[in-house]
Amino acid sequence: MPEVSLIIEDPNNEQPKPAALPENLKVVETNELDRNAMGGTELMKYGLHERLPKELLEKFQIIPTRVRDIDPDRIPLLWVHDLAHDPEVKHLDKVSAEDLKFAKLIFVSYWQLQQFRDFLNVPFSKSIVMPNAIVPIEEHEKPDDVINIVYHTTPHRGLELLVPVFEHLHEKFFAEMKKEVHLHVYSNFDIYGWPERNKPYEELFDKCREHSYIHYHGILPNEELKKQLQKMHIFAYPSIWPETSCIALLEAMSAGLLCVHSAYAALPETASNWTMMYPMTEDHQEHCNRFADQLLSAVQMVDQEFIKDRLSMQKRYTNGFYNWDIRIMQWKAMLEGLLGNDE
């Protein structure tokens, strides 16, 4: 379980050994696919279990998408993070509210819930939306002598569009600007414990490494990544992946970044109209053109005072609505309500 086990230094200077897991984390549901992962879903499930009271965790089995076993001694809840066409959720297809194995289906966005309703006909009466949450990024000053663009999610979600667009914009526009424009890439599949999936993207990673103004960093633990976001100005995300929510976008908004992304899947709902969205298109070249226009505008505007004021409002909104302190109260109220209904 990465980044959860604590390390205790032995007083005799022997090999460090893992500390015992906190009680709340002993009941976190894991499976063969996510045991070594620390992506957005894992950040959410560990974050939830760290914050919920032990007495509630003893009464509820909270399963993030992939059902392996159902505990007969606890009330089962299915916390769905994936898409409606994922094979892991096929068992929900046309199951009536009466036959559903779970006391509640918990979704992370209304877009996602509607997809499950349209494709699998899940019962609205058993469904609830509980948006994702983050720990707000603290107030900070950004570098004033450079413009830093960041991409900090897995490569299959849009890196193949971003790199050639940045190369083109740098050659045609950025190289002539007063401030240098740099792209920082934090991306690979090691975050999920799937290094073998990096292979199709190695050529793209090499292009990043070879460009003087693109900096390929691999991946970082989430806490270190959030510190790096404080140095960034723009989140560039030409998303081609149907996000059910997006932790990377939430953390970028909390860090006060001007976010440029496609209006695809749950991204408009997640962004709540604070970002620079552009219409999605299936055409790869047209997508690059739309993204390039928007990214160039973002770079040209990011230093203007009205943009800084808007980003300050964006940060306050994100830190309020998507704050774990708020979300955990909603989770507790929901669970306590289910207990009341079960009595």
Predicted regions and their residues:
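N-terminal pre-catalytic "stem/leader" segment of glycosyltransferase-like enzymes
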Residues: M1-I70
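Conserved donor-binding/catalytic core segment of Leloir-type glycosyltransferases
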Residues: E141-G158, V163-F166, H184
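A charged, aromatic-enriched C-terminal amphipathic alpha-helix characteristic of glycosyltransferases
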Residues: M38-L43, E282, E286, F306-L339
